[in-house]
């Protein structure tokens, strides 16, 4: 199975990582891509900083989310690809899942109730609404 593991470096990512580590069916014989999204900086700031500094910022931002997963996977002998994009997290996750033919998206969620999601919104809720493939939310 082709799995997209969406991460943001939060405690919710840590919980999803712990879940993945203890559920062999998610790790065994699956192609896992760990995916982070760097939020776009305002165009004016990017123009002032220049392309190389802006790219370095995006790379460093994504690495904050990817590095702990890369280290945990290496320690557990889990093979995975690591990728990142710039954009809105929910849009980028749903787009990547569809574009690259993933069969499952795994991600952490803070677990707010329905009312909080209506008022506050959440990346997980938006991914559920936008994604065409199954999404496994870990709370």
Stretch-by-stretch model annotation:
Residues 95-139:
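Gly/Ser-rich helix-loop-strand patches that form or flank binding pockets
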Residues 52-64:
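A short acidic, glycine-rich active-site loop
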């Amino acid at each position: 199975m082709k799995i997209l593991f969406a991460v943001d470096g939060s405690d919710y990512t840590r919980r999803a990582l712990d879940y993945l580590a203890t559920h062999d069916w998610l790790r065994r014989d699956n192609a896992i891509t760990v995916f982070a999204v760097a939020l776009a900086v305002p165009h004016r700031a990017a123009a002032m900083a220049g392309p190389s500094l802006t790219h370095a910022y995006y790379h460093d931002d994504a690495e904050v989310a990817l590095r702990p997963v890369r280290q945990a996977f290496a320690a557990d002998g889990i093979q995975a690809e690591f990728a990142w994009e710039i954009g809105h997290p929910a849009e980028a996750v749903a787009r990547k899942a569809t574009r690259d033919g993933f069969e499952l998206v795994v991600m952490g969620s803070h677990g707010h109730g329905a009312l909080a999601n209506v008022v506050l919104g959440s990346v997980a809720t938006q991914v559920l609404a936008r994604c065409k493939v199954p999404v496994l939310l870990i709370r």
